[in-house]
């Protein structure tokens, strides 16, 4: 679970910004609280209030720790342009089964780490300074890595430990594995002037292919019908790719060519909703919130 996130000098965040997920001083609905942290929430604000950039900041971690899909084009102009500081700083705080995990690092662009540190229950277990090329790992089972960790490789040392060691079966290492698993199952998706996602999986599967390949086309039709969108959907293959088409008497049309912007956003929402069965651990979406909230309000008991 996320406890806290802090970012500084990344894109619009000239000064340090902290987003706290602890529920200590607030009265929230109990169903959105887990391990005393907020597990579900909405961040809203006027246009240009940095909501999208906050999402990119939170998901910066997947760039160097995972092999998942990445929105690298969104990380142009990485550093804040009003700040003379040439370093962006990130700090993530998690809690897994009562154990605190703090991961922090600095970068000067999306792909270049300057330093990183991982602590479990206030004990620093991995550290590396990429400028001085010095560091260490204290996790049991990584002894041999200490001979090669101080190299010129730009790879995250946390990622290096995860990919190249057989960790001993102890509580500290289990917490480390839960941290890696959490980051590997984070997902950001959006639908604004274009659709995209990063984290959780790889590839460019279309929404139509994803729904059809999951065997969910009839359920997707029912999903839309319950909202009052009376489409009769069918699968149609075009140039070797599966597409969703709408049938109208003796005619048919590509769903995504006739659907409204709001309906397309619902299709995107549904695409990722049916994947939540695969245990997405952290989800951030930036799409037509009004449409989704109206759906939830109208069909909350469905």
List the predicted regions and their residue ranges:
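Switch/communication elements of ASCE P-loop NTPase nucleotide-binding domains
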Residues: 1-65, 247-302
């Amino acid at each position: 679970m996320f406890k806290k996130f802090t970012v500084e000098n990344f894109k619009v965040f000239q000064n340090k910004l902290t987003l706290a997920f602890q529920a200590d001083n607030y009265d929230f609905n109990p169903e959105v609280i887990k391990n005393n942290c907020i597990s579900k929430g909405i961040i809203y604000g006027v246009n240009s209030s940095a909501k999208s950039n906050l999402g990119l900041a939170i998901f910066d971690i997947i760039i160097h720790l995972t092999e998942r899909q990445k929105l690298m084009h969104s990380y142009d102009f990485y550093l804040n342009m009003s700040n003379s500081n040439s370093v962006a700083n990130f700090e993530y705080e998690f809690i897994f089964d009562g154990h605190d995990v703090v991961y922090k690092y600095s970068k000067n662009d999306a792909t270049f780490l300057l330093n990183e540190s991982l602590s479990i229950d206030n004990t620093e277990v991995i550290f590396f300074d990429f400028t001085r090329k010095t560091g260490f790992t204290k996790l049991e089972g990584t002894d041999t890595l200490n001979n090669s960790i101080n190299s010129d490789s730009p790879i995250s040392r946390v990622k290096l430990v995860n990919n190249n060691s057989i960790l001993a079966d102890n509580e500290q290492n289990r917490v480390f594995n839960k941290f890696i698993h959490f980051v590997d199952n984070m997902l950001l998706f959006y639908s604004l002037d274009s659709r995209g996602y990063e984290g959780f999986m790889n590839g460019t599967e279309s929404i139509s292919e994803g729904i059809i390949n999951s065997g969910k086309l009839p359920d997707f039709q029912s999903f839309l019908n319950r909202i009052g969108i009376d489409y009769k959907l069918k699968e149609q293959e075009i140039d070797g790719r599966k597409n969703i088409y709408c049938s109208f008497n003796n005619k048919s049309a590509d769903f995504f060519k006739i659907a409204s912007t709001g309906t397309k956003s619902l299709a995107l929402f549904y695409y990722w909703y049916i994947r939540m069965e695969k245990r997405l651990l952290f989800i951030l979406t930036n799409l037509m919130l009004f449409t989704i909230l109206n759906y939830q309000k109208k069909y909350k008991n469905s």
